[in-house]
């Protein structure tokens, strides 16, 4: 693709990029209330309204982390054609960082509507000879990625534009210099451009073309749902209103925290003298005017509608969790709840997580296929994925179901769903070893009996 066309595509991407950055700012508890406040303040015209509290609430962060932890506290398990040796190779390539990266993908997708994972081959050289190759992968900021799809029902990924800014040291300068990088990836090559400054419209410094060997665009999209909609879009307006009500409440408490004194025929020169006398002597002096009216002191206290604000805050908080499909809040005690009751408690979170899992299954399938291609494996049929939710459960019920399932369904499936089993392969190995020892013991006892 020509550079000018790439520049035009990046220029047209500003609105999408801004929307993504806004969602991320809410995740870091930097809501719009911090920029806008409750109302535009003009202290000269309205000196009684000086407070400008801007209270940002992190409901969005709570809901996103809740979903990511619910889905990816435990690693996704992959099984390729029930081939234990191949499964171990894939697990080794994924590495110890896989669970953390999967969780980060869920957070990024929840914030931005989609998350992107980039994979590549890290090569080690001895002279000009390649001595080692390692499959690497990592999560890329969504705002940096512009996907280009082929026309068709399946919307196959044709190319990816990635653009980002980097600060680099420059010889002879104390401060770092900003450079803009633009990468254009296809299924065969990478075109990489470097520009001076914070825009791809600056002067071009270098351009390199590199070939890669994956025969596919080395990026995988992980969508939050079929609409690629962020979680924030479901409840942003409600959250903004909650921030405004709470901030306005704090402003009222700060502005109207003192009693207003109404003075009649005060025998002093200014109000500061009145406050000094009241504080020091607990009394004030008053005078009688020309008409014979004596002075006096009255107080006025403004009532703040506390109860009304409390009610609307409770309604808004409940609606945030309803729209965000989060776990029910302020639940005091579940006790020894049954499995059915616990599933009902998680029902909304499970519905939301199920939409993400459906999209992630297809994406993880592409990642595993790329790893198998790197390993030189082509003769496989099925990639099975197993997800384990991080949720409260009734272990007694689960163990009872597992016991009653023995002899009805395969042992490996029982182990996969047993509440005490984290590593299915290890549990199966120990189980078979134990069965072997028991069989050997029975055989020895029989031989001793016959002798």
From Swiss-Prot:
Short name of one Pfam family: SPP1_portal
Keywords in alphabetical order: Capsid protein, Viral capsid assembly, Viral contractile tail ejection system, Viral genome ejection through host cell envelope, Viral genome packaging, Viral penetration into host cytoplasm, Viral release from host cell, Virion, Virus entry into host cell
GO cellular component, one term: viral capsid
Parts of the chain that traverse the membrane: none
GO biological process: symbiont genome ejection through host cell envelope, contractile tail mechanism
Signal peptide as annotated in the record: none
InterPro entries found in the cross-reference section: Portal_protein_SPP1_Gp6-like, Portal_SPP1-type
Intracellular or extracellular location(s): Virion
Protein's job: Forms the portal vertex of the capsid. This portal plays critical roles in head assembly, genome packaging, neck/tail attachment, and genome ejection. The portal protein multimerizes as a single ring-shaped homododecamer arranged around a central channel. Binds to the terminase subunits to form the packaging machine.
Family classification: Belongs to the SPP1-like portal protein family.
Binding partners and assembly: Homododecamer.
NCBIfam families (alphabetical): portal_SPP1
Protein name: Portal protein
């Amino acid at each position: 693709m020509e550079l000018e066309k790439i520049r035009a595509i990046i220029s047209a991407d500003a609105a999408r990029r801004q929307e993504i950055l806004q969602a991320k700012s809410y995740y870091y508890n930097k809501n719009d209330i911090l920029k806008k406040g409750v109302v535009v303040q003009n202290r000269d015209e309205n000196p009684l309204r000086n407070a400008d509290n801007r209270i940002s609430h992190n409901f969005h962060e709570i809901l996103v982390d809740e979903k990511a932890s619910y889905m990816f506290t435990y690693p996704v398990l992959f099984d390729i054609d029930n081939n234990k040796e191949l499964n171990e190779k894939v697990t080794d390539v994924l590495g110890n960082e896989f669970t953390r990266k999967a969780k980060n993908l869920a957070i990024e997708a929840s914030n931005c509507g989609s998350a992107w994972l980039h994979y590549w081959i890290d090569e080690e050289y001895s002279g000009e000879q390649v001595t080692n190759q390692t499959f690497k992968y990592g999560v890329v900021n969504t705002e940096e990625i512009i996907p280009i799809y082929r026309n068709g029902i399946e919307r196959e990924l044709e190319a990816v534009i990635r653009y980002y800014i980097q600060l680099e040291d420059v010889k002879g300068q104390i401060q770092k210099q900003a450079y803009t990088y633009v990468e254009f990836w296809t299924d065969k090559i990478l075109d990489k451009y470097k520009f001076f400054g914070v825009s791809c419209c600056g002067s071009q410094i270098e351009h390199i073309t590199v070939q890669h060997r994956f025969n596919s665009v080395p990026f995988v999209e992980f969508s939050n749902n079929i609409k690629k909609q962020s979680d924030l879009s479901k409840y942003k307006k409600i959250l903004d209103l909650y921030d405004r009500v709470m901030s306005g409440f704090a402003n009222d408490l700060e502005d109207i925290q003192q009693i207003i004194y109404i003075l009649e025929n005060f025998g002093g020169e200014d109000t500061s003298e009145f406050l000094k006398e009241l504080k020091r002597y607990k009394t004030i002096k008053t005078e009688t005017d020309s008409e014979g009216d004596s002075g006096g002191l009255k107080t006025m206290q403004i009532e703040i509608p506390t109860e009304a604000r409390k009610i609307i805050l409770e309604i808004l908080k409940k609606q945030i969790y309803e729209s965000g499909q989060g776990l029910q809040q302020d639940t005091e005690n579940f006790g020894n709840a049954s499995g059915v009751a616990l599933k009902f408690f998680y029902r909304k979170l499970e519905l939301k997580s199920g939409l993400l899992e459906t999209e992630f299954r297809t994406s993880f399938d592409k990642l595993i296929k790329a790893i198998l291609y790197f390993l030189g494996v082509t003769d496989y049929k099925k990639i099975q994925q197993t997800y384990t939710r991080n949720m409260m459960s009734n272990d007694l019920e689960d163990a009872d179901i597992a016991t009653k399932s023995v002899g009805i369904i395969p042992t490996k499936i029982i182990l996969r769903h047993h509440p005490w089993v984290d590593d299915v392969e290890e549990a199966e190995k120990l189980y078979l070893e134990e069965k072997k020892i028991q069989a050997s013991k029975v055989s020895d006892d029989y031989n001793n009996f016959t002798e």
